[in-house]
Amino acid sequence: MRSLADFEFNNAPLCDGMILASEMIRLDFPTQFVYDELERLVSLAQEEISQLLSQDEQLEKLLALFYGEWGFTDSRGVYRLSDALWLDKVLKKRQGSAVSLGAILLWIANRLDLPLVPVIFPTQLILRIESLEGEMWLINPFNGETLDEHTLEVWLKGNISPVAELFNEDLDEADNAEVIRKLLDTLKSSLMEERQMELALRVSEALLQFNPEDPYEIRDRGLIYAQLECEHVALTDLSYFVEQCPEDPISEMIRAQINTIAHKQIVLH
């Protein structure tokens, strides 16, 4: 099994990195099905979209296929948020998150030689393409709609701060490894809320491959271990966080949790 730390995310499609991470977390992840389905969509797109069309026309046709004929859409009807993040489930149900829908669309677009790239906007992942004339086109991966600067500023003011401003670097191409880390963070939170603690632990372990000494990730792993009633390991992880980040406002709460676990161990013994 390849390691996430050794994988060159930026030299591979985003889907490849997501599939590798998924294989490490879910023993039942159907890698072959996902690749077969991605290839099927590429073939359908190649049949429908003429290479003689302009770049803009090809992209418009791809968006019409993806969100129209193929029916990909956002995850409003999905019962469990984690189902909107796993590529196999998104390909089956056609409902996903910005990252999962964006990754599938990027896979197809790049196979058609359309230079679509991911952007980690402060509120969600968006997609960007530059025309041959140098004009930038921004796309919302939830629905394929074009985004203008006014819409992005409204998102910033509504979600970040009423005084937030849009900067050029907000629209820079994202590092694939960073997209994967953000996806795994969201997946871990979703699995914890869904009480799928064993899977959440595997996500935490995957995230630690990027930065094995990250105190915040070690803290989260400790909290998951505590939920799984692995108190001894939980104490080790939570204590590490408190030692590394004594000034962090959440440290006081973690200290209280450490005391609760330690007291529970004394009572049990």
Swiss-Prot record:
InterPro entries: SirB1_N (IPR032698). Disruption phenotype: Not essential for the ability to invade cultured HeLa cells (the invasive phenotype). Pfam families: TPR_9, Transglut_core2. It comes from the Bacteria. NCBIfam families: PRK10941.1 (NF008188). Belongs to the UPF0162 family. Required for maximal expression of sirC, not required to invade host cells. This is Protein SirB1.
